[in-house]
């Protein structure tokens, strides 16, 4: 009886997690820091295992995740690409629940899911099938899917937040900052 209740409780929580039916406190206090921390730790581990001294002026960021020149960094960042999409799973549902129904909300929802799936597939491809040779088409495809989905998906929700702030005559700085931060990965790619 206790095991059945435990299973039902876990299943209920996982269902709420996937639907994004979580509190703002959990999303902002747990998911956000874990996602950012995962990227930071993965990048730090990749830099510390780079065989040469990392100099941002002379070394490409992609060399941190090179299976040929930095296999340990490649493995660490591949693991991050497995963890981060799992952490991002509740965001499309949560963010959709923050705004009224519209075409941009639906587009943001689907783009964000598309990017999360692409990032997870990139993590699987990088971690399970490391390639010290030339870059495979699948790697380029999953990277493109992740960028095409995540950046515009977050941008759509940032624009909705900006619009809401504009209509309510509140500060536009948080929404504008979110838009700027979320455009950087797309510009860098």
Label every model-predicted segment.
Residues 115-162:
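Membrane-proximal helix-loop-helix units in multi-pass membrane proteins
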Residues 64-85:
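Interfacial helix-start motif at the membrane-water boundary
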Residues 5, 80-90, 146-157:
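Hydrophobic cores of alpha-helical transmembrane segments in multi-pass inner/ER membrane proteins
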Residues 157-189:
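Terminal transmembrane helical module of multi-pass membrane proteins
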Residues 1-22:
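Short, Lys/Arg-rich, polar N-terminal cytosolic tail immediately upstream
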Residues 23-49:
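N-terminal signal-anchor transmembrane alpha helix
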Residues 94-107, 160-171:
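Membrane-interface helix-boundary motifs at transmembrane edges
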Residues 44-67, 122-128:
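Hydrophobic transmembrane helix segments
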């Amino acid at each position: 009886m206790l095991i059945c209740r435990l299973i039902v409780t876990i299943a209920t929580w996982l269902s709420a997690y996937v639907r994004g039916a979580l509190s703002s406190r959990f999303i902002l206090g747990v998911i956000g820091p874990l996602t950012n921390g995962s990227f930071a730790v993965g990048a730090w581990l990749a830099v510390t295992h780079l065989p040469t001294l990392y100099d941002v002026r002379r070394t490409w960021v992609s060399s941190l995740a090179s299976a040929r020149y930095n296999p340990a960094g490649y493995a660490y960042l591949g693991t991050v690409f497995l963890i981060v999409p799992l952490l991002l799973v509740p965001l499309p549902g949560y963010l959709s629940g923050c705004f009224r129904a519209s075409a941009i909300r639906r587009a943001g929802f689907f783009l964000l899911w598309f990017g999360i799936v692409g990032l997870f597939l990139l993590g699987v491809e990088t971690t399970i099938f490391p390639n010290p040779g030339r870059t495979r088409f699948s790697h380029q495809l999953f990277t493109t899917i992740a960028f095409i989905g995540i950046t515009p998906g977050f941008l759509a929700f940032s624009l909705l937040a900006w619009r809401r702030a504009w209509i309510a005559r509140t500060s536009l700085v948080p929404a504008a900052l979110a838009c700027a931060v979320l455009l950087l990965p797309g510009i860098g790619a």
